[in-house]
Amino acid sequence: MKKKNIILISVLLGALLLLTGCSMDPSQNTDGFFSTYLIQPFTSFIMFVAKFVGGNYGIAIIITTLLIRALIMPLNLRTAKAQMGMQSKMAVAKPEIDEIQARLKRATSKEEQATIQKEMMAVYSKYNINPMQMGCLPLLIQMPILMAFYYAIRGSSEIASHTFLWFNLGSPDMVLAIIAGLVYLAQYFVSMIGYSPEQKKQMKIIGLMSPIMILFVSFTAPSALALYWAVGGLFLAGQTLLTKKLYMNKHPEIKVMEQEEKEFEQIVEEQKKEK
């Protein structure tokens, strides 16, 4: 789990640096691979869609965002299925894992800790538990899409100068930036449904980094990028709720584990109050 968190944090920080620190002139014509095969096709597609919606580039960006999300939806569903499968295995292995973790806390020497950690790895192997199997591919795929959106908007005077609702697509908008951040914060809480309190604590930092990064970047990036995030986040939240409903019905042991964790936390809280 720690290795996966490091990978995700690296990806998010990479996106932050790229979107806030790139110095390439977006108006400059380039014949590079990224420009030729990603930026220019994105720009052309947005303009193509805009022709069918009365030249409204805001609606064109929304449609493009939904199409992108629909295209990567099978990959997201596969990832969600893997996550639910991992949660199911963790629920079954939980009694053994809890017992080993308790002994690990009582261990007094490094040799004893190493021996107990080997036992933990044996349990993981026994139940075929590997958090890295859940993967980060959906997030990695979105990186070039974000960059293409960014430069397509800044490189097109038609898109950059277009006003949609109350904001200009080519300029930052604080209200939309906050909306995009809140949408992804809500999406994070939706994604935590079904996880045990202990797992939620482990994933809290990486989970909150995404909305914080989106909020930070949206304050300085073209508002069209915040629009992409807001629409994409709403789509992703709905998709997550759907997959949770579908897969959690197939893995009732996850609900049992979550209920047991909640009951345990309530007992701990009551004991603290009594003291």
Curated annotation (Swiss-Prot):
Spell out where lipidation (S-diacylglycerol cysteine) occurs: 22
Lipid moiety-binding residues (N-palmitoyl cysteine): 22
* GO molecular-function terms, A-Z: membrane insertase activity
**Keyword annotations:** Cell membrane, Chaperone, Lipoprotein, Membrane, Palmitate, Protein transport, Signal, Transmembrane, Transmembrane helix, Transport
Membrane topology according to the record = Multi-pass membrane protein
Q: Which CDD domains match?
A: 5TM_YidC_Alb3
Q: Which range is the signal sequence, renumbered to this chain?
A: 1-21
* Superkingdom classification of source: Bacteria
Transmembrane regions: 48-68, 133-153, 174-194, 212-232
Localization per Swiss-Prot or TrEMBL: Cell membrane
GO terms (BP aspect): protein insertion into membrane; protein transport
Question: A single GO CC term, please?
Answer: plasma membrane
NCBIfam families xrefs:
yidC_oxa1_cterm
As for what it does, the entry says: Required for the insertion and/or proper folding and/or complex formation of integral membrane proteins into the membrane. Involved in integration of membrane proteins that insert both dependently and independently of the Sec translocase complex, as well as at least some lipoproteins.
Q: Which family does it belong to?
A: Belongs to the OXA1/ALB3/YidC family. Type 2 subfamily.
Q: What is this protein called?
A: Membrane protein insertase YidC 1
